Amino acid sequence: MASSSSMQMVHTSRSIAQIGFGVKSQLVSANRTTQSVCFGARSSGIALSSRLHYASPIKQFSGVYATTKHQRTACVKSMAAEEEEVIEPQAKVTNKVYFDVEIGGEVAGRIVMGLFGEVVPKTVENFRALCTGEKKYGYKGSSFHRIIKDFMIQGGDFTEGNGTGGISIYGAKFEDENFTLKHTGPGILSMANAGPNTNGSQFFICTVKTSWLDNKHVVFGQVIEGMKLVRTLESQETRAFDVPKKGCRIYACGELPLDA
């Protein structure tokens, strides 16, 4: 399977000095293709933009990553009775999918996501099929390759594993379906990209409200169970390029009945 030549990124709300994304000197020295969600980059990849990098859309990486250190918190089981921060869905949930996650080789819990298929059916079908693996490829075994506390966790690059790859069920990329749904708070599930109409398989889960990403990234679902696990992932200690020091891997994934 062909992989993307550039990195998908998500821009955060921190200062440019802290993240090193919008810093001109860094961008000049790392003059590469930035695919939405900019946070600095490697040779190329998809990254999300921060608020300080407000002028740039969340793109696939190709900038300069900032080295940020986060305190690793104890793993907490994501039981329904312990859930927190579950916001009201913006649309009808048409499908439920899940990620079973391990951190550092140890089982950490499950994240359940509701998808909004009536609003963005094409985007939802892409994500759903990559969760089930029915196309013979998908998210199983892939990692959350980029984590930024108080912003988001990013994953979905199952071809390269570093933010430079991933493909959709429709081919390498597909168009932005619409921007009807917004990045309203923690748990929002949205597509990482490398600019307009470059959606593949990379996605991110917000841990705060990220309104600066509205109209740049396609929102298609939200976490309905497992926000405590999302917080645990968000708090992982990272090294250069916001890569978690301990592997954060999706060891199983699939679709659930709506009434489950």
Curated annotation (Swiss-Prot):
Q: Give the domain of life.
A: Eukaryota
Distribution of this protein across tissues and organs: Ubiquitous, mostly expressed in leaves and flowers.
- Its EC number(s): 5.2.1.8
Predominant subcellular localization, coarse grouping? plastid
How is the activity of this chain controlled? Binds cyclosporin A (CsA). CsA mediates some of its effects via an inhibitory action on PPIase. PPIase activity is optimal in reduced form and minimal in oxidized form. Reduction of the oxidized form is mediated by thioredoxin (TRX-M).
Q: Which PROSITE patterns match?
A: CSA_PPIASE_1, CSA_PPIASE_2
Q: Which GO terms of the molecular function aspect are on file? A: peptidyl-prolyl cis-trans isomerase activity
List locations, semicolon-separated: Plastid, Chloroplast stroma
Return the GO cellular component terms, semicolon-separated.
Answer: chloroplast stroma
Could you point out where the transit peptide sits in the sequence? Answer: 1-79
GO terms in the biological process aspect are: protein folding
Domain PPIase cyclophilin-type, first and last residues per copy: 98-255
Q: What does this protein do?
A: PPIases accelerate the folding of proteins. It catalyzes the cis-trans isomerization of proline imidic peptide bonds in oligopeptides. Required for the light-induced increase of thiol accumulation. Assists the folding or assembly of SAT1 enzyme to form the cysteine synthase complex. Links light and redox signals to the regulation of cysteine biosynthesis in response to stress.
Subunit field text: Interacts with SAT1 and A.tumefaciens VirD2.
The name on file for this protein is Peptidyl-prolyl cis-trans isomerase CYP20-3, chloroplastic
Organism annotation: Arabidopsis thaliana (Mouse-ear cress)
Q: What is the lineage of its organism?
A: Eukaryota, Viridiplantae, Streptophyta, Embryophyta, Tracheophyta
> Source gene?
CYP20-3
